[in-house]
Amino acid sequence: MDSDKILNAVKEARTLAKPRNFTQSVDLIVNLKELDLTRPENRLKEQIVLPSGRGKDVAIAVIAKGDLAAQAEDMGLTVIRQEELEELGKNKKTAKKIANAHGFFIAQADMMPLVGKSLGPVLGPRGKMPQPVPANANLAPLVARFQKTVAINTRDKSLFQVYIGHESMSDEELAANAEAILNVVSKKYEKGLYHVKSAFTKLTMGAAAPIEK
């Protein structure tokens, strides 16, 4: 899709949203067509690094013990230790709250079997299974990447909605993020953006602004 048309849609989305007493998020909505999404190879399951960043921090949880847990704690991340992990396996309500409150999960590799057993049923359907890392990993580069990343997982749905930033970001920054996501969609399919029936940008409390094809 043409960069100018994406930018125009971002600008229009702003005009369609009334000012609120909170900073509204901006989303890209994409409606796919002529794809058999019961076939796994046609589904979109991607982590996309946004060129303009997310504009705000995303909550990250680290499932770890020992030095890795201490490193995560020093970075101000949510830390889930082994004993807490075992408890979460018994308390689905709390597990769901943690899953919904965090955008990404990182897990010490040797704890992954326990993660799968305890949190897998909650994280798996949300597309949030942890990124495994060794016990001596430096978390900083991975955390920095996740702070600029959004995840898409269409499963068998033809429509997906994904965060591209918030209203305090410039139109150009938001448009660049939207374009990066559409480029991933284009590269996924042999016919590229032909499979995009329609696309929109939208603020939290505003109407959707169509991106002209």
From Swiss-Prot:
Keyword terms of this UniProt record: Repressor, Ribonucleoprotein, Ribosomal protein, RNA-binding, rRNA-binding, Translation regulation, tRNA-binding
Molecular function (Gene Ontology), one example: tRNA binding
Cellular component terms (Gene Ontology): large ribosomal subunit
A GO BP entry: translation
PROSITE patterns, A to Z: RIBOSOMAL_L1
One Pfam match: Ribosomal_L1
InterPro entries: Ribosomal_uL1, Ribosomal_uL1-like, Ribosomal_uL1/biogenesis, Ribosomal_uL1_3-a/b-sand, Ribosomal_uL1_arc, Ribosomal_uL1_CS
Subunit structure and binding partners: Part of the 50S ribosomal subunit.
Function: Binds directly to 23S rRNA. Probably involved in E site tRNA release. Protein L1 is also a translational repressor protein, it controls the translation of its operon by binding to its mRNA.
Family: Belongs to the universal ribosomal protein uL1 family.
Protein name: Large ribosomal subunit protein uL1
Lineage: Archaea, Methanobacteriati, Methanobacteriota, Methanomada group, Methanococci
Gene that specifies this protein: rpl1
